[in-house]
Design a protein with these regions (language model features):
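Extreme N-terminal starter segment of soluble prokaryotic enzymes
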Residues: 1-5
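Class I SAM-dependent methyltransferase "Motif I" SAM/SAH-binding loop
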Residues: 8-12
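Gly/Ala-rich phosphate-binding loop of Rossmann-like dinucleotide-binding domains
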Residues: 20
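Short beta-strand element of Class I
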Residues: 25-27
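Conserved acidic E/D residue at the C-terminus of a beta-strand in Rossmann-like folds
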Residues: 30-34, 97-98
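Class I S-adenosyl-L-methionine
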Residues: 56-64, 71-162
Length: 162
């Protein structure tokens, strides 16, 4: 049986492709921007639900092993909405991907909230160029929250050599 994931703020499909390559089944993807959804559907032959994090009813999100939130283009209120969804449903594992600057605020304000929900948290800051073949200089925080020991989580590693 495959592991399953729900993708929030699916963008053009980068997280989806990453999870598919890791052997996960994508149960559902959400994306608020209709133009971006068109690109996503060109990249990945899967339907996307057009809605923002603030408009998702937690009861309608499928049960899955992982909830993955792409918050790389988000503001702080998107973090709030993602945590509201998590609080209502408490999935087994959560992945947050966000710009390094947003992570600094996230840890100060929300890390204890996740711990109160029973999550163990680990994170790593990763340069985009380390995990893609593109010469990008953006640094992102990958935050894994798991309701069991987080020490067995594997962080992304470089897959493309120059």
């Amino acid at each position: 049986m495959k592991n399953t994931v729900v993708i929030f703020n699916a963008g053009i499909g980068a997280l989806t492709l990453g999870f598919q390559n890791a052997g996960y089944e994508i149960l559902k993807a959400y994306e608020p921007d209709r133009k971006v959804i068109e690109i996503y559907q060109e990249n990945i032959s899967q339907n996307v639900t057009a809605c923002s994090l603030s408009s998702i009813d937690p009861a309608t999100v499928p049960d899955s092993d992982v909830w993955a939130f792409d918050l790389t283009q988000s503001k702080a209120e998107e973090v709030f909405y993602s945590l509201t969804l998590v609080q209502r449903r408490r999935p087994p594992a959560i992945l947050f991907v966000m710009k390094k600057q947003l992570w600094k605020g996230f840890i100060k304000e929300h890390i204890f909230q996740l711990q109160e929900y029973g999550y163990h948290i680990t994170h790593k800051n990763i340069q985009s160029s380390e995990v893609t073949a593109f010469p990008l200089r953006e640094e992102f925080a990958y935050i894994v929250s798991k309701r069991v020991n987080a020490s067995d989580m594997i962080m992304p590693v470089q897959v493309h050599k120059e």
